[in-house]
Amino acid sequence: MDKQHNINRRDFLKIVGISTLGATASLYGCSPKKDSEKEGNTTVPVGKMTYRNFPPYEDKVSLLGYGCMRRPTLPAPDGTGNVIDQEEVNRLVDYAIEHGVNYFDTAPVYVQGWSETSTGIALKRHPREKFFVATKMSNFSNSDYDFGVKMYHNSLKKLQVDYIDYYLLHMLGAPGKKGLEGRFLDNGLLDFLLKEREAGRIRHLGWSFHGIKEEFDKALALHDKYHWDFIQIQLNYSDWKHASGNNINADYLYSEIAKKDIPVVVMEPLLGGRLSNIPEHIFTRLKERNPEGSVASWAFRFAGSPEKVLTVLSGMTYMEHLQDNIRTYSPLVPLTQEEKDFLEETAQLMLRYPTVPCNDCKYCMPCPYGIDIPGILVHYNKCVNEGYMPKSRQDENYAKARRAFLAGYDRSVPKLRQASHCIGCGQCNPHCPQSIDIPKELHRIDRYVEQLKQETL
């Protein structure tokens, strides 16, 4: 590794848990993740990737896009936290490009602000024409014009590029001053970005969305005035007709965008991993239908089948996930109507399980009081899906389930970062794209933990 890479890697110190505790919950929760089991088809095709192109644009974009919200990490040399494993990031990016992936999506706020730098280091080692890079204006906390312009220029610097292929107004959907008007229209930032697009430093300008229908309709209606080049939405077979919280069903979002002939970038095809870490009988149902394919491949085939989808983002922290997704899209086998109906039935089955709609995005972090919010919610959801949520001491597997939940909780989340330490300040709530009442959920989980400890269920 050269000097530049060593310097950056040493600088990638982050607060303990921001990058790894969510992964720890998956590794040391109630039981190993089912979908990581060896699949029947282990061949990873080369030169078979499905690409999408939407004239008049010339871009030939891989259907599999690389989401850079999460990164592999290593313990920091000084023991104070964790560092991005830049060598592993480079290896994953090299492998992705070798197998046809050419779209890389990042943002200034990802990985505690280090994702753009890490992504830039990995991509700089490849010819510029080999990849498209997407990043965002994540001006959630400060909508000042100068702050936004500085964020944009910093993105160019960190990514080590002269232009950005796909630039997004990040996470539209909140009403009022935190919405489109307050963050981009009233302060002149959208005018600035339009000029950057005209100058060629932004090749395609669009926005990503989480939020209420009125804000979506408002932003989409501005297409005639501003000409959005693409729009990024949450789309998966669960949210297609059963979106939770304030989110809108993906079939509505997609159909409205398609009416205007705008390409769609898909995020959350796995709902933050919840569509691969599923209850045992649903896992069996999917595997019986297609023994050779992974459970995740069902979700990716669903997300990639709509014809207006440009690319489907996946945060592939591990090589096995990258390889599995490459297999799914090399080439894509679109879902039949019968298979779509099968997945709708599967989505309805999953609604019976009271999981918290957390996608492990970590926008709620860091908590000012050190609570590992995503680690807690990921562990809780995992135990719900795997049947380790006893409702009564009379349950047949009460002792086993109680032990699995409590032991897994302590392994996944350090005691000082558990839900019992939440004071309910609510600073996390405005940042959650799923509109979860986070303190309420943490207090509910803490009460349940205490009932398990005291055996008072």
Residue ranges and their predicted role:
Residues 54, 66, 104, 119, ...:
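Conserved, mostly hydrophobic/aromatic
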